[in-house]
């Protein structure tokens, strides 16, 4: 004890680091490969590794991982189940209660609208709506492809999959009056830190790949959490991707299979090219290189990516010629995938197999924990339940004299009222028109406060959330047959699989959330889960079996 005191603060810090390193070594895990198969339900994993009603299984690589892995059939992602809060649940351990991010398209009453290209921060003049030192007047927060520096407002997509650095057009960002009317980058929205920041602070190397430059979000409040952030734009014009081929299917090197579609999400084939591009980045990182192939002789301590192929396979109705379409999704309530969806699931399984093979080739497999989950599910699974009435919520409220400053709709409706004193009127109106809006559950007042912050004091929390009946999507689009973002089990009951050769294969049926992944990753690396602010705020434990 006297020796410890005599070492002073620097020596004590060293001892603490050694203690952490000892726990790290004892766990036998040097790194974590984290994967989100967006849209992948728990039932999808069960079906693909076990087969459905006597049919053969169709995911040999996921099945092999499950042999030495823990599956969690009753895992739930965030509510709302949008990609932004869904990913933050995984990498912060927080729900929107602590992270305070509800959707990639939401609202903040304390911020000001973006500057415009001709009169904004690019030429040093603040937007007229932004007054330094005065909160508001409020603005939509839209963090998607429309932030890209090469986004084309006419086509609605970016002109290239590789968005030129720095990637995000500052004139499209909301402004913060309390910070000199400076632009609010996605990472500036963050109120809690991420596992990337904790691992980087402990000396680790970090990498992540996702679908928009707006996923700068994962950098956390510091803006520096991810050393190698690779974000090819998914909503960009399709084009050949040099060096990319989908094993056993087709090459994307000189041309894509469907060159005439709007973007990568509009083709069951092209989306495979897009995802394979990111898979190649992971393979490069396993080889001790950056996502771009630069040799750095370092394999990340935490790295990973999201897949979009399954999500596209669940949602898309693809027009293949003037008169014909191909429809994805499921064939029944049991989750039998349609042929297009089956192809996407098998592609992702094969891609996971590529990563496992490369880890083994580099003698890294035994010391790597592989965690596979999903930011969100997709609803409905049962195609008979699909109901697309369009926007029926806003007109009902408008007729009652209730104006909205923002409505965000998918298979959920998040409502921000212009006048928050009209909340009771809005609730009464919605309840009176329950059949017309296909209402299942309404969250406001006390029911909202059980999940989130108070919208009267928190500038981002919606005043009302409308959960519609299962299968209802507030759209009239003929291009999709499913959506996510909602609170239903189809939206939230996602796969979670944690695998390593040292793990005894089993299923743990306890109810868990994807929030528990973040503290689990840190504990497996010998780091303190309570280093995560959201974990402390919400008292989030590690996953059973990984504590």
Regions found by a protein language model. Give the residues of each.
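Short, solvent-exposed turn/loop segments enriched in Gly/Ser/Thr/Pro and often Arg
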Residues: 71-91, 209-219, 308, 533-540
